[in-house]
């Protein structure tokens, strides 16, 4: 096993091959045990031609550093167009011309709700004709839609919701009666 490991190390270049180093030594300096071992191994070596490695002459390459030169640095400026803000002829909040009312029967009608709301049109969803599981899915979809487009969702009645875009403000009865909200708050 040690011989196989040694051969693997020699093959990978992790150790030197001692067989060739022994051949170059004078025979008088080797002990008799190694000579006896060579006699047994000699029959294996006779089939192979002997390879002698001659030392290579050392080649020295002289590298000289490049001569230092100084050069002018020219700054490069990128041409930027002059930007003039446009004045809008329309008002910043467009007038509300329509409200969409949708009575979905299946969850597949969520696309029409999303398209209308994305265009900035307030949507009233009447989910009374839907079963509870699909109605819940549609409310979850609408909540995500409202959150993504910075709008608001309000519950009008049981299973009826109002989706209002960010540019639409909804006035409710609570806002009209501020005294009733603060009447019980005596802190």
UniProtKB/Swiss-Prot annotation:
Q: Which UniProt keywords apply?
A: Cell cycle, Cell division, Cytoplasm, Septation
Pfam families per record = SepF
For bias type Basic and acidic residues, the affected ranges are 16-65
State the function annotated in the UniProt record.
Cell division protein that is part of the divisome complex and is recruited early to the Z-ring. Probably stimulates Z-ring formation, perhaps through the cross-linking of FtsZ protofilaments. Its function overlaps with FtsA.
Q: Report the principal subcellular site.
A: cytoplasm
Cell cycle recorded as keyword = yes
Keyword match Oxidoreductase: no
A GO cellular component annotated for this chain's UniProt record is:
cytoplasm
A Gene Ontology annotation in the biological process aspect, one of them, is:
division septum assembly
InterPro entries, alphabetically? Cell_div_SepF, Cell_div_SepF/SepF-rel, SepF-like_sf
Residues covered by region (Disordered): 13-74
Give the protein's recorded name. Answer: Cell division protein SepF
Family from the record:
Belongs to the SepF family.
The record describes its quaternary structure and partners as:
Homodimer. Interacts with FtsZ.
Q: Where in the cell is it found?
A: Cytoplasm
């Amino acid at each position: 096993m040690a011989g196989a490991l040694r051969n693997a190390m020699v093959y990978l270049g992790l150790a030197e091959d001692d067989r060739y180093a022994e051949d170059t030594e004078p025979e008088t300096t080797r002990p008799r045990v190694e000579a006896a071992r060579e006699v047994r191994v000699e029959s294996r070596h006779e089939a192979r031609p002997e390879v002698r490695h001659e030392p290579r002459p050392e080649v020295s390459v002289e590298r000289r550093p490049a001569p230092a030169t100084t050069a002018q640095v020219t700054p490069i400026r990128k041409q930027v167009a002059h930007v003039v803000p446009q004045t809008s002829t329309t008002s910043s909040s467009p007038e509300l011309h329509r409200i969409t009312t949708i009575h979905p029967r299946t969850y597949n009608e969520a696309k029409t709700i999303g398209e209308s709301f994305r265009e900035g049109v307030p949507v009233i969803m009447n989910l009374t004709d839907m079963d509870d599981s699909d109605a819940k899915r549609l409310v979850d979809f609408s909540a995500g839609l409202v959150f993504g487009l910075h709008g608001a969702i309000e519950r009008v009645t049981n299973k009826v919701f109002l989706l209002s875009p960010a540019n639409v403000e909804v006035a409710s009865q609570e806002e009209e009666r501020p005294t009733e909200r603060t009447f019980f708050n005596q802190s």
